[in-house]
């Protein structure tokens, strides 16, 4: 701005000097020289105006570009969530590691039911979940091969010494097959995987829990609705090694997730059921997330009602309300 002001001051000084000289020529009766100076001043003035208009136009273009960039920064959340599910967002990480399931920390997790002797109904719950692409297109179908790891913990932070009441570990391997359906473009993929789940405990207190599943799932995105059904088959174990023989009775053979993905919030509903009318068991979970600071960190509310929230409680009915923060979806 200081340089512009000095330049304009110099221009005004030169213009005033030329104008004074033209007036002197008029007084002397030399109208020809006076007109030449007036013409020269007019050309200079028009040149300055053109330069100013070009400068204003350039500034306007820069401002519009800046606004466009800012608008592009806020992307459609529904496509971000789908990209995360399909593993398309890992290019932002040089190691190719990306989030898999929800990653959250819920310091306020209250159970309306007893959690056993000497356990506080109030605790913290958190989950870490990542995936890594290994390779792709071995079959010529544009398929992608992944390993993934999810850990969910229930932490008695309000008790003396703050022990971990339960931790579930879920390593898995899966293959994503893209679907190219001309008339059904909302069908995005077919996923086939094998999943191990364990609480990492020994048999000394009869608290060991583990099982293995083969599953198939797909993701269906229609406008801002995301639908993810998943079916599984439990890999059989011998009676000697099976430490939770009735787990299918409480967990069933499927779950479905239905989510509405707004611009800065999401609502997700998870349903699971054994489809037995005479002895029905299952679970429902409702997730609400709102991007408070517009930076990808969500205020997160989770409500669970049913069986199988954790392996240690898979055969116990629990109702829980939890809140905290979610950092990826």
Segments the model singles out, each with a brief description of its role:
Residues 25, 96-121, 135-263, 271, ...:
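Outer-membrane pore/translocation modules
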Residues 126:
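Gly/Thr-rich phosphate-binding loop signature of adenosyl cofactor/nucleotide-binding cores
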Residues 130:
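Carbohydrate-binding surfaces of carbohydrate-active enzymes
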Residues 255-256, 260-302, 307:
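Long, repeat-rich segments with strong aromatic
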């Amino acid at each position: 701005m200081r340089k512009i002001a000095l330049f304009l001051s110099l221009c005004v000084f030169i213009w005033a000097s030329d104008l004074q000289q033209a007036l002197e020529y008029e007084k002397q009766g030399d109208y020809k020289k006076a007109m030449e100076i007036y013409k020269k001043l007019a050309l200079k003035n028009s040149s300055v105006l053109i330069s100013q208009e070009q400068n204003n136009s350039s500034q306007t273009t820069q401002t519009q570009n800046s606004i466009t960039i800012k608008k592009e920064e806020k992307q459609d959340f529904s496509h971000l969530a789908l990209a995360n599910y399909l593993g398309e967002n890992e290019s932002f990480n040089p190691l190719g590691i990306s989030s898999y399931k929800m990653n959250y920390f819920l310091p306020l997790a209250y159970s309306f039911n007893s959690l056993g002797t000497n356990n506080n109904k109030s605790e913290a719950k958190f989950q870490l979940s990542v995936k890594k692409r290994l390779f792709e297109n071995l079959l010529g179908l544009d398929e992608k091969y992944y390993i993934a790891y999810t850990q969910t913990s229930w932490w008695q932070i309000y008790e003396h010494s703050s022990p971990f009441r339960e931790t579930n570990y879920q390593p898995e391997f899966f293959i994503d097959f893209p679907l190219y359906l001309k008339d059904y473009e909302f069908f995005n993929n077919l996923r086939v995987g094998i999943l191990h789940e364990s609480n990492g405990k020994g048999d000394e207190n009869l608290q060991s829990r583990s099982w293995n599943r083969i599953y198939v799932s797909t993701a269906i995105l229609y406008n801002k609705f995301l639908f993810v059904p998943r079916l599984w088959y439990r890999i059989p174990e011998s009676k000697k090694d099976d430490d939770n023989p009735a787990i299918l009775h409480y967990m069933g053979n499927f779950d479905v997730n239905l989510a509405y993905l707004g611009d800065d919030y999401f609502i997700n509903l998870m349903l699971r059921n054994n489809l037995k009318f005479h002895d029905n068991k299952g679970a429902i979970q409702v997730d609400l997330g709102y991007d408070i600071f517009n930076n990808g960190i969500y205020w997160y509310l989770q409500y669970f009602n049913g069986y199988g929230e954790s392996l240690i409680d898979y055969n116990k009915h629990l109702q829980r309300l939890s809140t905290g923060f979610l950092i990826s979806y």
